[in-house]
Amino acid sequence: MAGPLRAPLLLLAILAVALALSPAAGASPGRTPRLLGGPMDASVEEEGVRRALDFAVSEYNKASNDMYHSRALQVVRARKQIVAGVNYFLDVEMGRTTCTKNQPNLDNCPFHEQPHLKRKAFCSFQIYSVPWQGIMTLSKSTCQDA
């Protein structure tokens, strides 16, 4: 009688161990488990995120026909994904500055306050970086007026 029960009990034990070790087992209620290799939240203070943001803003300004530079007003969300390099996903509120494009230093440019010159945009940037090879590319960029 012990023989016929052994196989189902063994399968049940294997299933219990597999469930206990699955990524979903450690997830908090109401939160989806983080996938290995999937995007994860990143801090704007991280050096890689800062470099990706600077690169995205530079590319945004190169592609813009505006006579004024724009810069980040606020980083709404920053995520990163480790692949053969790093994908950065940045949601950024951009603002038009008082500096024209022939002025090189964008860091200290104030934002326009005059209503007819003030302009904001909400942008989502995807930047691919391979830091050890010095590679950084803007994979995707979408913006809409805010």
From Swiss-Prot:
Q: What's the superkingdom here?
A: Eukaryota
Q: Motif (Secondary area of contact) spans which residues? A: 81-85
Q: Which PROSITE patterns match?
A: CYSTATIN
Q: Does the keyword Disulfide bond apply?
A: yes
One MF term in the entry's GO annotations: cysteine-type endopeptidase inhibitor activity
Kindly list the residues the record flags as site (Reactive site): G37
- Residues that the record marks as modified (Phosphoserine) are S43
Pfam families named among the record's database cross-references: Cystatin
Signal peptide interval: 1-26
Q: Which SMART domains match?
A: CY
Membership in a protein family? Belongs to the cystatin family.
Name this protein carries in UniProt: Cystatin-C
Q: Which organism does this record belong to?
A: Saimiri sciureus
Taxonomy of the source species = Eukaryota, Metazoa, Chordata, Craniata, Vertebrata
Q: In the UniProt record, what gene is named as encoding this protein? A: CST3
